[in-house]
């Protein structure tokens, strides 16, 4: 567990993820989602003097934590970029095709969720922001204030998997015409009233808030770009480990890996003359999908939805 600004963050699948990378003492590794550094610190503890670790994050608080770690350990560097830009960073550093392993731990961190000022939570009132990097892009409040009702409904349904998306979006637009939304509790209350069928044990604003967060941060677009960039960055034999926290993320990861296990021929027209290697898989899967253990679930209930998939680059 690491502690940051009074908020606890327990790294999910800590040992399992680092073990999945099959670390070499002199290898070069990328932590695409540094967060509060749980995975990075364990990786560094297992690297030798020649080993290197490059961390990525969009969150300014995560960057501050990473800079402190970099000052302590010269083998580590942190950059304030999305892992979707991993390819550009790797190319700038001359590391293309030389990376031994990439770790992506997706979603929002506990410090982000638990700090009301970040605007991610419907349980604790705060400014309606939701941006991983508050200095980049539009906030959730700006989106809610300007988007057409159809776009708001699409975000709730497509990214939040909210079945009452249309009804909830109409309630949001009706209310914003009288008074703009600036606080999370205000939006959560309108969503709560508009949701006619509450799920047992789940706040009625949960899915809509998830949809907003994913949209504001382009999380699924970043994931698709980041997976491609990570594979390109890896050396042959390098490993990619991805931890996802909801079905939309896991579906993208699963389909990406499944496509590469089959090779590229599935995407080509029939009877097209091709070289034999397009039938060869680009990756192999390492074991089955992994989930949090019973012990981890007891220690950290937020790990219940975590699933990790691991692949090794073949060519």
Swiss-Prot record:
Keyword Zinc set for record: no
Protein's GO biological process: rRNA base methylation
Residue spans crossing the bilayer: none
Any one GO molecular-function label of the UniProt entry: rRNA (cytosine-N4-)-methyltransferase activity
Record Gene3D superfamilies: Putative methyltransferase TM0872, insert domain, Vaccinia Virus protein VP39
InterPro entries: RsmH, SAM-dep_MeTrfase_MraW_recog, SAM-dependent_MTases_sf
UniProt keywords, alphabetically: Cytoplasm, Methyltransferase, rRNA processing, S-adenosyl-L-methionine, Transferase
Chief localization: cytoplasm
Single GO cellular component term: cytoplasm
Disulfide bonds: none
Ligase keyword on record: no
Entry EC no(s): 2.1.1.199
Biological role stated in the UniProt entry: Specifically methylates the N4 position of cytidine in position 1402 (C1402) of 16S rRNA.
The protein's name in its UniProt record: Ribosomal RNA small subunit methyltransferase H
